[in-house]
Amino acid sequence: MTMTNDPVVIMKQEVGKAAASRVKSDSIVGLGTGSTTAYAIEYIGERLKSGDLKNIVGVTTSFQAEVLARKYGIPLTTLDVIDRIDVAIDGADEVDPNKNLIKGGGAAHTQEKIVDSLAEVFIVVVDSNKLVDKLGSTFLLPVEVIPKAVTPVMRQLEQLGGKPELRMGVRKAGPVVTDQGNLVIDVKFEGIDDPATLEKTINNIPGVLENGLFVGVTDIVLVGEIIDGKPSVREIC
């Protein structure tokens, strides 16, 4: 891994390494999206190169993850040709005490949900500031929507008590476009009391492909922290 003196970067590296160390030979691995997950992908590649890990294939959740996996020499497959995923590693934008998540800051939550929900073991890697008492406390809820349905979907999200905004690109003109060619609406809720019900309700709105609530799918959360100036990793099961 890249050498650095930045304790935050070192902490993310340690969390990624802790997750990657749980990958076993002869397995199919879901490879998620995000800065911490990127270190897990890198370390899986290092284990393959050293011979510590053998005969694995990855299933990626985004174009970003695919690029990283290929960079680090991880063989890839697709959901069309496999019937299981042994372990998936992914990040999150918020994690509540029940290990429910908000994901989608990278606009990849639809593919992430497909891969993560199929995994026998789903490991979430985060830093401690992603832990919240209630989902929606600090992060907007992403909703992927087909382009023609943006306006009616936004109206229905408002009726649910949300404040929706179309996500715009940072280094491009116009809105963010997902890997599926759709748009993303970010919705502010003043705390989500019942994430399971809200997840289903939003997904039943015509024009919505998927939203960023992940309910009841997480097995393990690996949390990176800086204690007394030093990085550490703790596990929530």
UniProtKB/Swiss-Prot annotation:
<feature type="binding site">
    <location>
        <begin position="33"/>
        <end position="36"/>
    </location>
    <ligand>
        <name>substrate</name>
    </ligand>
</feature>
<dbReference type="GO" id="GO:0006014">
    <property type="term" value="P:D-ribose metabolic process"/>
</dbReference>
<comment type="pathway">
    <text>Carbohydrate degradation; pentose phosphate pathway; D-ribose 5-phosphate from D-ribulose 5-phosphate (non-oxidative stage): step 1/1.</text>
</comment>
<dbReference type="InterPro" id="IPR020672">
    <property type="entry name" value="Ribose5P_isomerase_typA_subgr"/>
</dbReference>
<feature type="binding site">
    <location>
        <begin position="103"/>
        <end position="106"/>
    </location>
    <ligand>
        <name>substrate</name>
    </ligand>
</feature>
<dbReference type="InterPro" id="IPR004788">
    <property type="entry name" value="Ribose5P_isomerase_type_A"/>
</dbReference>
<comment type="function">
    <text>Catalyzes the reversible conversion of ribose-5-phosphate to ribulose 5-phosphate.</text>
</comment>
<dbReference type="GO" id="GO:0009052">
    <property type="term" value="P:pentose-phosphate shunt, non-oxidative branch"/>
</dbReference>
<keyword id="KW-0413">Isomerase</keyword>
<dbReference type="InterPro" id="IPR037171">
    <property type="entry name" value="NagB/RpiA_transferase-like"/>
</dbReference>
<protein>
    <recommendedName>
        <fullName>Ribose-5-phosphate isomerase A</fullName>
        <ecNumber>5.3.1.6</ecNumber>
    </recommendedName>
</protein>
<feature type="binding site">
    <location>
        <position position="130"/>
    </location>
    <ligand>
        <name>substrate</name>
    </ligand>
</feature>
<dbReference type="Pfam" id="PF06026">
    <property type="entry name" value="Rib_5-P_isom_A"/>
</dbReference>
<comment type="similarity">
    <text>Belongs to the ribose 5-phosphate isomerase family.</text>
</comment>
<feature type="binding site">
    <location>
        <begin position="90"/>
        <end position="93"/>
    </location>
    <ligand>
        <name>substrate</name>
    </ligand>
</feature>
<comment type="subunit">
    <text>Homodimer.</text>
</comment>
<dbReference type="GO" id="GO:0005829">
    <property type="term" value="C:cytosol"/>
</dbReference>
<dbReference type="GO" id="GO:0004751">
    <property type="term" value="F:ribose-5-phosphate isomerase activity"/>
</dbReference>
<feature type="active site" description="Proton acceptor">
    <location>
        <position position="112"/>
    </location>
</feature>
